[in-house]
């Protein structure tokens, strides 16, 4: 079992149940999935960009990403319907907890000028989104082998009913919020 999953079951869930005054263990908020998305506008001019992004996300997550395509043409962005414009991965269960553990323990401390995560990046329903400016903060990515620095979006979907519940859950996981 993943280290963070065990910590959640044995320490975080009972503490949150008491803190949020919940009557049932199933009411305790938990992380259901983590979605990583890489929007690649530069893929319009160069098709190799998609291959490099797929390889990077696969190294980071240990799971093969899905290529996303434009739903409709937008002349202003020089995009045609059906063109590949990004890659995404959805992590659940064990892989999700393993990734979360690596993100908190290894990757976030490697961010340059890191002052903590914004505690206001919740969506109103307890889900948290954050952006990473460069993929080299992950130890799986070899700096010498990358073609360009690319950012990615990380979204944590939780069963929390409000932002306060979601914030309490992520604080229990020791998320480094700055405010």
Curated annotation (Swiss-Prot):
What does the UniProt keyword field contain? Answer: Ribonucleoprotein, Ribosomal protein, RNA-binding, rRNA-binding, tRNA-binding
| Keyword presence, ATP-binding | no
InterPro entries with a match to the protein in the record: Ribosomal_uL5, Ribosomal_uL5_bac-type, Ribosomal_uL5_C, Ribosomal_uL5_CS, Ribosomal_uL5_dom_sf, Ribosomal_uL5_N
**A biological process term (GO) from this entry:** translation
| Entry GO terms, CC | ribonucleoprotein complex; ribosome
Drop me one GO molecular function for this one.
rRNA binding
The record describes its quaternary structure and partners as:
Part of the 50S ribosomal subunit; part of the 5S rRNA/L5/L18/L25 subcomplex. Contacts the 5S rRNA and the P site tRNA. Forms a bridge to the 30S subunit in the 70S ribosome.
User: What's this protein's family per the entry?
Assistant: Belongs to the universal ribosomal protein uL5 family.
Biological role: This is one of the proteins that bind and probably mediate the attachment of the 5S RNA into the large ribosomal subunit, where it forms part of the central protuberance. In the 70S ribosome it contacts protein S13 of the 30S subunit (bridge B1b), connecting the 2 subunits; this bridge is implicated in subunit movement. Contacts the P site tRNA; the 5S rRNA and some of its associated proteins might help stabilize positioning of ribosome-bound tRNAs.
In terms of PANTHER family, this protein maps to: 60S RIBOSOMAL PROTEIN L11-RELATED
NCBIfam families linked? PRK00010.1
The entry's protein name is Large ribosomal subunit protein uL5
Instruction: Provide the species name.
Output: Pseudomonas putida (strain W619)
């Amino acid at each position: 079992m993943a280290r963070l999953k065990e910590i959640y079951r044995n320490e975080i869930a009972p503490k949150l149940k008491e803190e949020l005054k919940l009557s049932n263990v199933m009411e305790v908020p938990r992380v259901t999935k983590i979605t990583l998305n890489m929007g690649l506008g530069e893929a319009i001019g160069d098709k190799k960009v998609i291959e490099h992004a797929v390889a990077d996300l696969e190294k980071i997550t240990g799971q093969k990403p899905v290529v996303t395509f434009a739903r409709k043409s937008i002349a202003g962005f020089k995009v045609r319907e059906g063109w590949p414009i990004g890659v995404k991965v959805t992590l659940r269960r064990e892989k999700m907890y393993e990734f979360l553990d690596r993100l908190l323990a290894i990757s976030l401390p490697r961010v340059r000028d890191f002052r903590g995560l914004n505690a206001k990046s919740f969506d109103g329903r307890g889900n948290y989104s954050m952006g990473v400016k460069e993929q080299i903060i992950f130890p799986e990515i070899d700096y010498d082998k990358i073609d360009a620095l690319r950012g990615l979006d990380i979204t944590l979907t939780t069963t929390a009913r409000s932002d306060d519940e979601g914030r309490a859950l992520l604080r229990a996981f020791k998320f480094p919020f700055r405010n």
